[in-house]
Regions:
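Active-site helix-to-loop segments that bind/position phosphate- or nucleotide-bearing substrates
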Residues: 1-18, 23-25, 33, 60, ...
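Extracellular/luminal Protease-associated
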Residues: 35-49
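Short hydrophobic alpha-helical runs that function as membrane-insertion/retention elements
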Residues: 41-44, 63-69
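Short, amphipathic alpha-helical "recognition" segments used to contact nucleic acids or chromatin
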Residues: 336-354
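Residues in the recognition helix of alpha-helical DNA-binding motifs
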Residues: 369-370
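Short Lys/Arg-enriched helix C-cap and helix-to-coil transition segments
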Residues: 374-390
Length: 390
C-alpha cells in the first residue's frame, strides 16, 4: 500500500508529454509512464481539476483515484476495469439467495472479526488496563440461527470491544471527549463530533477504498453481501470484508493518538463537525500504510497484510464458486510496535537512585523516561536497558 494524499486547494492533475503532472501552488510532482510509485491517489481537496487524459493515464497504470467528502468519508472512486466473471457473480447471487449458505459466510466473517478484535485487545493489555470480563462472556454466547441473531451477537461483542477502546482513547486524549461510535457495528458515521471519530471515519474511508479495489480485482459484485443487507446505492460486500480489517484502522488511530495530538490538529466546521487538518491526515495515512505493509507469515511464507487481504477475498471467491467446500478467513493478529509494557514501565518507576547506580543506568536517561511515564507518554526501551531492568 502506498497512497498519495492530495489535500487543500488549487490541485491540478494533467498529462504533459506523456508525463502525469500534479500541481498545487508552487509544488509540482511529475511522473514518467510506468514509473509512478503510488498505487492510489486520495483527494481531500476543495477546488481543483483533473483532465480526462490524466484519468486515462491513472487507469492504464492501475492507480485508483478516491475522492473524499468534506467530512473524510469516501465520496466516489475510480478503479481500473473490473475482472469480468459472470459465472462467479451468478454463484455469488446463489449463495446469497440460499439462507443456509448466506448465514455460513456471514458467520465466518463475524468469527474472524471477533478473533482480530480480541487479538488487538489482548495485545493492548500489555500496555493498557483491559477488562476482559464482559467481552469474554459475550464471545461464549455464540448462539445464532439467522442473520438477525448473528448481528445481535456481533453487536454485543462490539459494545464490549468499544468500551475497552474508549478507555484507551480517553487515557491518551482526554480533551477529545470520545464517547463511542454512534452505531457500534454497522454504521457509516458520516459527521464526526469529536477528533477520534474523525480519525476513525478517515481511516475507514481508506480501508473501504482498498477493499473495493481488491473485490474489483477478483470480480465479485460489491452490491451483494452476506452480513450487511442489500440497499440502494450501498456496497454490502465491501462493508462485509471491511469488517475483517477494521482492527488495523483502530490500531493506527491509537498509534497516532500516542503521538499526543492536540485539538489544533483538527478543524471545527461552521456546523460544529470535526475534520482532519492536512498534516494530521498525512500522519494517519502513513500509519495505515506502514501497518498494511508489515509482513506476516501466511501459508508458510511472508506476505504484507495488504496481500493477505487480497488472498482472503480470493478465498471467498473460491468458496462461492465451489472450488473449495469450506470457508475460513485467515488473518494474522496485529503486531504492536512498542516494548514499554505496563510491567516494564512499573519497573522503571520503581528505580530509586541507589538502584539506578546498581543497575548502571544513566541518570539523565532514567529521569527522562520516568518523566515521560508520569506524563502518560510512550517510551522506547533499548535492549541494553531492558536487560538491566528485567
Amino acid at each position: 500500500m502506498n497512497p498519495l494524499l492530495l489535500s487543500g486547494f488549487g490541485i491540478t492533475i494533467e498529462v504533459n508529454k506523456a508525463h502525469l503532472t500534479i500541481k498545487q501552488k508552487d509544488i509540482v510532482k511529475e511522473f514518467e509512464p510506468h514509473r509512478i510509485p503510488y498505487d492510489s491517489i486520495i483527494i481531500d481537496g476543495h477546488y481543483g481539476s483533473i483532465s480526462f487524459e490524466a484519468m486515462r493515464w491513472l487507469s492504464k497504470h492501475n492507480v485508483s483515484l478516491s475522492l473524499l467528502n468534506w467530512n473524510g468519508n469516501l465520496l466516489s472512486e475510480t478503479q481500473p476495469q473490473e475482472t469480468l466473471n459472470a459465472d462467479l457473480k451468478i454463484k455469488q447471487y446463489e449463495k446469497y439467495l440460499d439462507p443456509e449458505s448466506r448465514l455460513y459466510i456471514a458467520g465466518q466473517i463475524v468469527k474472524q472479526k471477533v478473533k482480530s478484535s480480541m487479538g488487538l485487545i489482548r495485545a493492548f493489555s500489555e500496555f493498557y488496563n483491559i477488562d476482559f470480563g464482559t467481552i469474554d462472556k459475550e464471545i461464549q454466547r455464540a448462539d445464532y440461527n439467522n442473520i438477525s441473531s448473528l448481528m445481535m451477537y456481533e453487536g454485543r461483542i462490539a459494545f464490549a470491544y468499544w468500551k475497552e477502546l474508549s478507555k484507551i482513547f480517553n487515557q491518551l486524549s482526554p480533551d477529545f471527549s470520545f464517547e463511542t461510535r454512534k452505531n457500534l457495528s454497522y454504521s457509516w458515521n458520516m459527521n464526526a463530533s469529536d477528533p477520534i471519530n474523525a480519525l476513525l471515519n478517515y481511516g475507514y474511508a481508506i480501508l473501504e477504498s482498498t477493499v473495493r479495489k481488491y473485490i474489483n480485482t477478483i470480480g465479485l459484485d460489491t452490491s451483494i453481501g452476506y452480513l450487511h443487507e442489500i440497499a440502494p446505492s450501498k456496497h454490502p460486500l465491501v462493508y462485509d470484508l471491511q469488517e475483517l480489517f477494521r482492527y488495523v484502522i483502530d490500531y493506527s488511530v491509537i498509534e497516532i493518538l500516542e503521538t499526543r495530538l492536540k485539538k489544533s490538529d483538527f478543524i471545527l466546521t461552521e456546523n460544529y463537525h470535526i475534520r482532519l487538518k492536512p498534516n494530521t491526515a498525512k500522519l494517519l495515512i502513513e500509519k495505515i500504510k506502514n501497518n498494511f505493509n508489515k509482513r506476516y507469515e501466511f501459508k508458510n511464507k511472508q506476505y504484507t497484510l495488504e496481500t493477505i487481504m487480497l488472498e482472503n477475498i480470493r478465498e471467498l471467491s473460491r468458496y462461492v464458486s465451489g472450488k473449495i467446500k469450506t470457508l475460513e478467513f485467515r488473518i494474522p493478529d496485529i503486531e504492536i510496535s512498542r516494548n514499554d509494557t505496563i510491567y516494564i514501565r512499573n519497573k522503571i518507576m520503581s528505580i530509586d537512585p541507589e538502584k539506578r547506580k546498581e543497575l548502571k543506568i544513566n541518570k539523565s536517561t532514567l529521569w527522562y523516561q520516568q518523566k515521560k511515564i508520569k506524563e502518560g507518554e510512550t517510551i522506547k526501551i533499548y535492549n541494553k536497558t531492558k536487560v538491566k531492568i528485567e
